[in-house]
Amino acid sequence: MGIMTSFKARSAAAKISKGDIDGAMKLYKEAIDEGLTDVRYLLSYSVLLIRNSRFGEARELLVKIQKYPMAEDNRRQLFVNYASCVYKMGEMQKALDILERQHQKAASGLVYETLGYLYVEANETEKALAFNTEACEYDDEDSICLDNLAQTYYRLLNDKTKAKVYFDKAIAIKAGQIDTLYFLSKYDLEAGDQAAARAKLEKALTGRFSPLNYATKDMVEQEIAKL
């Protein structure tokens, strides 16, 4: 791996921090074509591919680099990214199996966040409740885990009162969290406060949507259009 290849990878990472995602992806692709082997940057590129719904490309890249030497936290990130890909490609059970194996090896916030959300998506009510409760005990300031538990109560148990407790905790920690804003806007609408609902939805629109968001950009825009 040459000096220019490393420079392109570092430049790509810098572009991400400045919000230039297209520029970052272009530089990462050039660096990979030139033989980039730094796992940190390859994982970063896989995340960009996933966020742009290029799941097949991300999966292919992750399979390629899984044999590379890497730190344990990077390997965990690789498996989480891979599970996200196969989930979005229609292989929910495979994604769950991968993440459950990772959780058995060691507890981590990243796995709690991702597996907890997938349990909700899979309508695994008992597992979702137990796991997301455990996740919030593991880290009661993880806004994603709090949102996962809130969604468990809201979507699977139809307990909106209990759900709101955790949505409120999540939004207090991360004010711009897309899914939390989306669900809290529904409480505003039920209370007849359209202005508050609109404010939350418009704030959600400014966020960076992920394939692991329940609320898509289209869903948020449609809700705003109804107001």
Question: Where are the regions that the model predicts?
Answer:
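Residue-level recognition of tetratricopeptide repeat
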Residues: 13, 47, 84, 117, ...
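Position-specific recognition of the canonical hydrophobic site in helix A of tetratricopeptide repeat
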Residues: 16, 50, 87, 120, ...
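Short coil turns that delineate tetratricopeptide repeat
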Residues: 36, 70-73, 106-107, 140, ...
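TPR alpha-solenoid repeat register
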Residues: 41, 75-78, 111-112, 145, ...
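TPR/TPR-like (Sel1-like) alpha-helical repeat modules
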Residues: 67, 172-175, 186-212
